[in-house]
Amino acid sequence: MLGYVHLTAGRPVLERRAAAGMTYWALEGDLDGGLFPGRRLRRWIGRLERCGVSHAALPPGREGNFAPLRPVLPDGLRLALLPQLLNALAPAGDTALLLADCADSRALLAAQLLARRFRHLRLETGAEQEALERQLLRQLGLTTGGGPAAVTVTFGPPPREGLPLYLTPDCALRQEVRYAWLDPSQAPPPEGLLSLLHRACRLPEICVKSVETLDRRRENLYNAT
C-alpha cells in the first residue's frame, strides 16, 4: 500500500483516498507540533504502517525522519516526463549533455529521449559509456559529440553547462516542477501524488507548466509558455 504525507498547519488527518484508479493513504497536517514533536511523528508513522503503508511520497528533504517508510521519490516521474520538462525549459541550442555515474537503463532512456530532440548529444556517463554510445549508434544512428551544451540533464554529477535539469534523488530540492491536469478546472496536482501514480503505473495525461531552479546560484524561472 502506498501513502502520501503532506505537512500543513492544523491537526493531522489520516484518510484513505483514490486517484486514477489507485487507492492510497493520505496523511496531512502538522506532524512537528506539540510538546513532544518527535513522539507525535513516530505515532503517526506507526498508524501509516498499521494501514499497510510501506512506501510513501514524503516531504522533500525529510525522508529520513519517516523511517522505516521507504520514500517514493519524484526522479522516476520526471524521467518519464523528460520531453515536457525540456519543453518547459526551452533551451536555445542544438546540443545536450547527459551526466551520470554509470550508463544504466535510466541513462539509456534519457539518452534516447535527448537524441530525438537535439542534433548533438554529449555523454559523460562513467562506466559502460562506450556500450551506451554503440547502442545509440545502432538504434538511432547517432554519433555522440557536439559543442557547448544548451541543457545538461544530470542523474548525479553537478551540471556546469547550459540550463540544468535534475533527475537526481533530491531533484525536488533542486528544482520545483509545476503540473496541471488536462482539465484546467481541476486543482493542480501535487508532485508527490503524481509520483505515486507513476509508481503504480496509473499516471494519467498531465502537463508540465514550469520548471524553477531552486539552487540559489541560479534562481531563474523557465515557463512552458
Q: Which ranges hold each PLM region?
A:
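Glycine-rich phosphate/diphosphate-binding loop of Rossmann-like nucleotide-binding domains
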Residues: 91-148
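Short, well-ordered secondary-structure micro-motifs within conserved domains or adaptor modules
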Residues: 1-6, 145-176
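Adenosine-phosphate binding glycine-rich loop
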Residues: 17-19, 28-30, 166-225
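Short hydrophobic beta-strand segments
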Residues: 1-7, 55-58, 94-103, 122-125, ...
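N-terminal glycine-rich phosphate/adenylate-binding segment common to multiple enzyme folds
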Residues: 41-70
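A glycine-rich, Thr/Ser-enriched phosphate-binding loop motif common to dinucleotide/cofactor-binding enzymes
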Residues: 69-85
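N-terminal basic/disordered segments at the start of proteins
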Residues: 1-23
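Well-ordered, non-membrane alpha-helical segments in soluble/globular domains
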Residues: 34-50, 79, 83, 107-111
